[in-house]
């Protein structure tokens, strides 16, 4: 596994996490 795929994987995880956090905040949970 090279550094590029590691960086992309981390970016996807952070993006998904922040997106779900925004959805949670707007739901009022």
From Swiss-Prot:
The portions of this protein that span the membrane are 3-23
This protein's membrane topology, according to the annotation, is: Single-pass membrane protein
Task: Name the domain of life this protein comes from.
Answer: Eukaryota
* Coiled-coil region(s): none
**Pfam families for this protein:** PetN
* InterPro entries with a match to the protein in the record: Cytochr_b6-f_cplx_su8_sf, Cytochrome_b6-f_cplx_su8
Protein keywords: Electron transport, Membrane, Plastid, Transmembrane, Transmembrane helix, Transport
Q: Which GO terms describe its biological process?
A: cytochrome complex assembly
Give the Gene Ontology MF terms in alphabetical order.
Answer: electron transporter, transferring electrons within cytochrome b6/f complex of photosystem II activity
* Residues spanning the signal sequence: none
Q: Can you cite an annotated GO cellular component?
A: cytochrome b6f complex
Protein localization: Plastid membrane
> For this UniProt entry, what is the primary localization, expressed as one broad class?
plastid
State how it assembles: The 4 large subunits of the cytochrome b6-f complex are cytochrome b6, subunit IV (17 kDa polypeptide, PetD), cytochrome f and the Rieske protein, while the 4 small subunits are PetG, PetL, PetM and PetN. The complex functions as a dimer.
- UniProt xrefs under HAMAP family: Cytb6_f_PetN (MF_00395)
User: What this chain does, per the record?
Assistant: Component of the cytochrome b6-f complex, which mediates electron transfer between photosystem II (PSII) and photosystem I (PSI), cyclic electron flow around PSI, and state transitions.
UniProt lists the family membership as follows:
Belongs to the PetN family.
Name of the protein this chain belongs to: Cytochrome b6-f complex subunit 8
């Amino acid at each position: 596994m090279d550094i590029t795929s590691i960086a992309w994987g981390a970016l996807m995880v952070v993006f998904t996490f922040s997106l779900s956090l925004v959805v949670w905040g707007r739901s009022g949970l």
